[in-house]
Design a protein with these regions (language model features):
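A glycine-rich beta-to-alpha transition motif near the start of alpha/beta enzyme domains, typified by
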Residues: 1-112, 144-191
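Active-site glycine-rich loop that binds ribose-phosphate moieties when present
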Residues: 118-132, 154-160
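RNA pseudouridine synthases
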Residues: 126, 134-136, 144
Length: 191
């Protein structure tokens, strides 16, 4: 199978994008997607996305994690997919993802750079997990823990622990946040 792949970068993440509007990539397996995302033996990426026809909108987004398994909504990925859709001639940027409807707009479109504004779902609920940690869903699950000093915190160790914690079936994104005066400095583990 010949695969026409595109590579997009957004806010520190990189993604492989395939135009699947004719469903020619529906036969890709978990192992094949994992291999494509492998940074040593494939194209390399934090995930793979398929641009597909939408049911209610012009297009939809299917997201796969780098391990090859289908994932949930990814904001950085969504912005990259909208830029890709624009480069493919799509002009209406309302689309469907696993968490529902999204609206985006292109603020600036260049050949190699695109600025995209993406409306994520509103977060109406969150679950307090401990005194300083919370679980919430932004379209994908997030464990958020407030820490004293994010630069000194063992992000890798704690991130690995929480990423696949038994309470979060299917895994979760892990964010460690330090309050700095009136602003916030986040540091994320994983995707």
């Amino acid at each position: 199978m010949i695969i026409h792949a595109y590579k997009y970068h957004g806010a520190g993440n990189d993604f492989i994008i395939l135009d699947n509007r004719k469903f020619q990539y529906n036969s890709l397996t978990t192992e094949q997607i994992k291999l494509l995302c492998d940074r040593h033996f494939g194209i390399g990426g934090d995930g793979l996305m398929l641009l597909e026809p939408g049911n209610r909108y012009e297009f939809s987004m299917r997201y796969f994690n780098a391990d090859g398994h289908e994932g949930t909504m990814c904001g950085n990925g969504g912005r990259c997919l909208v830029a890709f859709a624009a480069h493919k001639g799509i002009t209406n940027f309302e689309f469907e993802a696993t968490d529902g409807h999204h609206h985006a707009e292109i603020l600036e479109l260049g050949e190699r750079q695109c600025i995209v504004k993406l409306k994520m779902i509103d977060i109406n609920q969150y679950q307090q997990y401990s005194e300083n940690s919370y679980f919430l869903n932004t379209g994908s699950p997030h464990y958020v823990e407030f820490v004293e000093d994010v630069m000194e915190y063992p992000v890798d160790e704690k991130g690995k622990y929480w990423r696949w914690h038994k309470d979060f079936k299917g895994g979760t994104n892990v964010n460690f946040v330090e309050n700095v005066w009136t602003s916030v400095l986040p540091k994320q583990f994983g995707l």
